[in-house]
Amino acid sequence: MKGEKKSQGALRRTATEVKRYRTYKRVIPAVSGVIVALLVIVYVVSLLFGKYGSFTIKVKNYNDRNYAISLSETDAFLNPVTVLNSKANKDITNIDGNNLPENLNDINGEHNGKNYVAYTFYLKNTGTLEFSYDYKLLISKMTADIDSAVRVRLYFTPFYYTAESGVYDYVGKYVDYAKPKTGGNGAPEVDPVDRVMTNFSSAGVVTEGRIDGFKPGDISKVTVVIWIEGNDPDCTDDLLGGEFKLDMLFEIVGTDDD
């Protein structure tokens, strides 16, 4: 996949960078009903339960039961579902993306850090026939141009497990996505040191694509990481009050009968 990178070592930010280091907090409704002034919320409304979370993953139903996708927070699929919700709604501080740990793709389910949101899940062909599926990582809500400083890292291994051979792919490559550079005529953001971001696919879409040849028993692995990049020139007080919401959708679109 274009722009894929392997995990980098974790670093720490120094106090000398505090000038560009602003704190963003979520809205906290008080018991009295008074709403504290918000800075930034990074959340997604759960499509199933109406609760808040970091993001929601959903599989679109396919009428033929021979073609089925299930989701799980582990590759054992002991409790397969069609909707997953990361329930984190946490305070975060903008950070240098170089500070992210290198094991983000090694922990299942929700594994948020102090200054980032991370969620790992699996997608399995639980039907009886081979098919293709589309995936789309959507920005379903955004205000105050907060997306100009948000970064989304996607670890995506379409054939993490291949049922036919029984082989697992543990490499864990990733791509970092960002909105094109402000005033850059479509040029990508470049974060220190020389970390070139991949532009969002389009307005409202981080990335999308199609996976072909997904056979019964095959498993895909996905890790989504969200943070606010403190090195971005757009990471200013102008973002105060912004909201950001992600959904990831999967849909069966091609079968061996097509």
Model feature map: region roles:
Residues T14-T16, T23, T56, T74, ...:
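Residue-identity detector for threonine
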Residues N99-Y133, L138-S140, V196-D258:
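C-terminal, structured domain-capping segment
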Residues K5-A10, K51-F55, N63-Y67, T74-P80, ...:
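Generic structural motif recognizing short loop/turn segments at the entrances and edges of beta-strands
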Residues E17-S32, D96-D106, E110, A163-I219, ...:
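Extracellular adhesion/glycan-binding regions together with long Ser/Thr-
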Residues R20-K25, P29, L38-I69, G109-N185:
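Surface-exposed interaction patch
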Residues M1-L100, G109-E110, F244, L249, ...:
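Short, polar/proline-rich extracytoplasmic segments that appear immediately after membrane translocation
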